[in-house]
Amino acid sequence: MNKFEDIRGVAFDLDGTLVDSALGLAAAVDMALYALKLPIAGEERVITWIGNGADVLMERALTWARQERATLRKTMGKPPVDDDIPAEEQVRILRKLFDRYYGEVAEEGTFLFPHVADTLGALQAKGLPLGLVTNKPTPFVAPLLEALDIAKYFSVVIGGDDVQNKKPHPDPLLLVAERMGIAPQQMLFVGDSRNDIQAAKAAGCPSVGLTYGYNYGEAIDLSQPDVIYQSINDLLPALGLPHSENQESKND
């Protein structure tokens, strides 16, 4: 029995699932840290902070940067810095700076993963409604989807500011299923991280975990999704569609 035979809609995470956004996010984080005269983190470190929305990203960046600054000053024999600004206020300032810089670099620092457009097109052609659920701040979502030419595939888009509770809370997924007019168990959710799989389980949605995303450096199998795929187009046969690579071969 195909565990996805009752699927009537598919929803996707964005960062690490459909798009590689690490370059743009890391650039904006580092520019914001630099503006506050704090150590910059670099892409490899920022990747481990992605997934819980911009506010949590700023908290993680600030915590690391203050610790790194203290370590560097101690190594150089300098006294620690007494911050006049409370950490909460610094997070707020950092977020404001991040939003400004990310708006400048988001499009040029974000790329579709392989087979994403073909897979979305095949699912849409099958008549399945498609949704997007991301913790990314809502104002950045629509312009990014348009720039990458994938906005046309989604009938429902939920950004991080559209719900009170972000993933891993089930609310965003339940809202998408409601707007699609289907039961949660009829909506497949595809993601790359622990947050995605936890949200799917809490909402009662079957889940696909992709291995190529960020996921805080953890293997996706630790989150126990219903199915694990190496590539996004691997989910097409499970939904009764030809693998996109096979389809491309037929069209050549």
Swiss-Prot record:
What cofactor requirement does the entry state? Answer: Mg(2+); chloride
Per the record, the pathway is: Organic acid metabolism; glycolate biosynthesis; glycolate from 2-phosphoglycolate: step 1/1
Query: Which InterPro entries does this one have?
Result: HAD-like_hydrolase_sf (IPR050155), HAD-like_sf (IPR036412), HAD-SF_hydro_IA (IPR006439), HAD_sf (IPR023214), PGP-like_dom2 (IPR023198), PGPase_prok (IPR037512)
Which Gene3D superfamilies has this protein been placed in? Answer: HAD superfamily/HAD-like (3.40.50.1000), Putative phosphatase, domain 2 (1.10.150.240)
Secretion signal span: none
- Could you give a single Gene Ontology term from the biological process aspect? glycolate biosynthetic process
Q: Does the keyword Hydrolase apply?
A: yes
Question: What GO terms fall under cellular component here?
Answer: cytosol
The reactions it catalyses are: 2-phosphoglycolate + H2O = glycolate + phosphate
Mind listing the UniProt keywords for this protein, alphabetically? Carbohydrate metabolism, Chloride, Hydrolase, Magnesium, Metal-binding
Q: Which GO terms describe its molecular function?
A: metal ion binding; phosphoglycolate phosphatase activity
Active site as annotated: 13 (nucleophile)
Q: Where does Mg(2+) bind?
A: 13, 15, 192
The EC designation for this entry is 3.1.3.18
PANTHER family given for it? PHOSPHOGLYCOLATE PHOSPHATASE
Give the record's subunit note: Monomer.
Primary role: Specifically catalyzes the dephosphorylation of 2-phosphoglycolate. Is involved in the dissimilation of the intracellular 2-phosphoglycolate formed during the DNA repair of 3'-phosphoglycolate ends, a major class of DNA lesions induced by oxidative stress.
Which family is it part of? Belongs to the HAD-like hydrolase superfamily. CbbY/CbbZ/Gph/YieH family.
Query: What's the protein name?
Result: Phosphoglycolate phosphatase
Provide the taxonomic classification: Bacteria, Pseudomonadati, Pseudomonadota, Gammaproteobacteria, Enterobacterales
